[in-house]
Amino acid sequence: MKNSKPKVKEKKEENIIKFDYMKTNKDNIINVIKFPIHINTINDIVVKVNKIVIHTYQFLKLYLIHLYNNNKVFPQINITFIEYIFIVLTKRKCNSGGYTEKTMPIQLKELTNFYNEYYKPLIISDDIIYYDKLNYVLDYEAIDIEKNINVNISEHFIKHLYKYINITLEAKEKRDQITKDYKDLKVRKEKHIELTQEIKKVKKDLTNFNELESDKKYHKWILEQRKLIYGNKIKFEENNIAYDLKAHPQEYLKSLFYICGELEKVYNQIKKHNENIKEEDDGEKKKKKIRLFNVIPLRNNIIGKNISLDSRTLLTNFLDKSLKTIEKEKKQIEEITDNKIKIKNSQKYKNADIKCNVHNIDIYNYKQGNNQKLLWDYFFRTNKRVFKKNKYRFNNMIKTDGVSVSILFVRIDDKGIPVKKQKGKKYKEQTDCEYIEKAKLTDELKKMKIVTIDPNDGGDLIYCGSKDEEGDLETFRYTQNQRRLETRTKKYMKITEKVNNETKINNQTIKQIESTLSILNSKTVNYEEFKKYVLEKNKVNKILYAHYQQEFFRKFKLNRFINMQKSEAKMIENFKDKFGTPDKIIIVFGDHDKGSHNMRGLEPSICKKFRRIFKNAGYKVFLINEFRTSKLCNCCHQELDKFLTRASSKPRDKKKNKKTLVNGLLKHTVSNPEGELNQIPLCTIIHNRDKNAVQNMLYIVEHIKKTGSRPEAYTRKELDLQTNSSPCKTLINNC
């Protein structure tokens, strides 16, 4: 049997340069700007750009739905196309340099016609934004929008496709029916595995164009879906859908519209079904709603976001010099210098002797000599420590939302010259860790103390364990609640909620105004429904823009970042005190984040960030495959089960007094008079899941140190290797 997923080509080490090409330092903008009056200018730009970007995403999605419904070809969503949308959505006080009816590109004409006919009626009349002096800032926004759309497609397409398959084939309903029909646990487990493998083969057939391997009853449906999802595509580049998604993400845009449309039909059926069921009706249960997704990401939060400011933006917005003034100054200088300056088509100064005065710098000569340094020195306190970084140099660019500022640095060589980016090379600091199962453990490493870490989604973010000199277990925890408290996330959320509940506009609180959007669906791909959403969203935004422009919303974001750095630094110091310095221990991290999942209702797991924190602190960090580390007892290495039930904390379950199994406590639930199962003695310990996991990891690492392989109980069998669809590639075959 072949593997269920095609192998992904390993990245060649020679194509990866192991340092970050750019880095940032973050601070409050008040600490770095010289003239506070310019903060008002920045805030004004932030507000305008935020409005333009919000409208751009909405306009783009509406336009694509229109094209999809009319079976028209989708445009290539690139920087030029996005900048055309900016032009369509905004006005200019100065029309010089704009397009005429004759010179206007065809694509821009089509967008203008769509705007006038369909989108303009959805905009509040006095919400039109002026484009003047924003072109350099919007250039960077166009880059970000294109990147966001491409990443959204390439990262999430397979997940959405798998969800569509599960819902269409009613995988959950079939699984529940098996649970209901088979009381014998062993038989039930076998039936569940059979169903899982059956659905996996369907997923495999829908992610390649090879011969069908699934059950024949699915073949007709699969062939139909291949045509509907992929259109005329008959193969993937490198015969791999993951590779093809990265190489040509926008070829899958229509596919996502189709998938979302089909899921929306199911969503509407469930909604209608639930609306027809009365609360007191015990005969028929309400169906669980499915979650839709946004094909095109929208900016629903209207709090000001970061914008990019470079030297050109400073010149056009801070010096307040119009192009006409620049042209006059150029002519005067040309006359004075007796033709030493040659100007051709208003392009650049050549061989000009310009005084070292910032007001003589313009968009034509800002790159000459020391001009950029003069410019930034004039407006910002560039002598401060925040503008310095070892092996890096300030790149004459910042990102700011009017409260925080991120200062961008570029890598320099030994001579202090910025490193030129090499085509085809990927720059990233080495955060990927080697698996302990594959690592070459030297005698020096074997003598070092081992600390294993089990990362989690909620509760304990990391649970660490190690053996002391007497062989007793030492533990260390860094919890979600500790992080929330130290970053003051919960405090800021409560303050924000209180303000939104107490502030009134037109006799309505902020919460009440926002609640009008709850009956509408921003994720819909139905043209009329999305139009209703855009119209209502624009009305709500118009009312709430002034409220969300208040500084404390952005200040809380900066405070959380600063507090998080302090919390993580404190965690590292406590870890050192508990286990020792980097020269004495090695860390083995569970590979929990190697999937694309995230548990609903919990904050995303941040395992990669934690590994980077420990590596930056100087520790040697390895990964370990977590297979069965929570499932098996660390004493007898037999399976554990959940046993304790308690009242569910979910609001919908509280009314029914529903009980759930506690996930964090495990024990052996099978027992017999001799206390043995299959001649293997069972222990009677009640295990904490995380504590059990780190002890199992310690056992596995010690076994690897002695034998070079994992213990058999923690090794995937041949069948597991063939059918496993986990993204983790480090599977040990020891059979």
Task: For each feature predicted by the language model, list its residue ranges.
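Positively charged, helix-rich recognition surfaces that bind polyanionic ligands
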Residues: 2-289, 293-735
